A protein has these predicted regions:
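Glycine-rich cofactor/substrate-binding loops
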Residues: 35, 50-212
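Internal glycine-rich alpha/beta core junctions
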Residues: 1-82
Length: 212
């Protein structure tokens, strides 16, 4: 049969690997911020030198095996492309290794991903704190659009907002505390009246279709 069928099958498994690798990366980033954590065993050790560490071992393993599976796709593509009238045996080693190992790797990453998802730990308090810190920066896009719709000069409004957001960000980095941007916007002669007409900055208004 055409080796294109081998490629099509492994390419589909490669798509699974891509999706689960993306999931593992996102989880590791969110865990570094403290929003999510993968499940941990009571006796699990993150580092022999640093007892406090809680490394995302499962997510790292998921990413590693997903990479392996993803890298099988171009090999099988080359195998299909270099066949001689479908009659040579120079594909025998790759077929025996790549096809079987790809299915084993796919099985492994699905099991690991399911294990992570079944025991995923969410820290709502950390999520709420980060939303409070970052939501004002997200909301200024809405403020800019409403200002333009009201007849304001886009470049002028953009520059005013840019300067205030940078000042607010710098203050948070150097002094800590809550995000001061809303108060800074309210005190601006042009942005303050626009802000007063805006709906409350409720997080739910900025999640798009995430709930779906």
């Amino acid at each position: 049969y055409s080796r294109l069928w081998d490629y099509r099958i492994i390419a589909r498994l490669g798509e699974l690997a891509i999706a689960l690798h993306k999931f593992s990366n996102d989880l590791r980033l969110l865990q570094s911020w403290g929003e999510l954590e993968e499940p941990y065993d009571a006796t699990q050790v993150g580092s022999s030198a640093m007892p406090y560490k809680r490394n995302p071992m499962r997510a790292e393993r998921l990413g590693s095996l997903s990479k392996y599976l993803m890298f099988q796709v171009p090999g099988v593509a080359a195998m299909a492309a270099t066949q001689w009238f479908e009659r040579t045996l120079d594909d025998s080693a790759l077929r025996r290794i790549a096809l079987t190992q790809s299915f084993l790797a796919a099985d492994a990453i699905v099991l690991i991903a399911r294990n992570i998802m079944d025991g995923l730990i969410v820290h709502p308090g950390v999520v709420e704190r980060r939303v409070r810190e970052q939501l004002p920066f997200m909301a200024v896009e809405e403020l800019l659009l409403s200002g333009v719709e009201a007849g304001g000069d886009r470049q002028d409004l953009h520059e005013r907002i840019r300067q205030l957001t940078w000042q607010a960000s710098e203050r948070m980095k150097t002094q800590g505390g809550e995000n001061p941007l809303r108060g800074m916007l309210a005190a601006d002669s042009q942005l303050g009246p626009l802000l007063a007409r805006q709906p409350a900055w409720e997080p739910e208004r900025f999640t798009g279709r995430a709930r779906e």
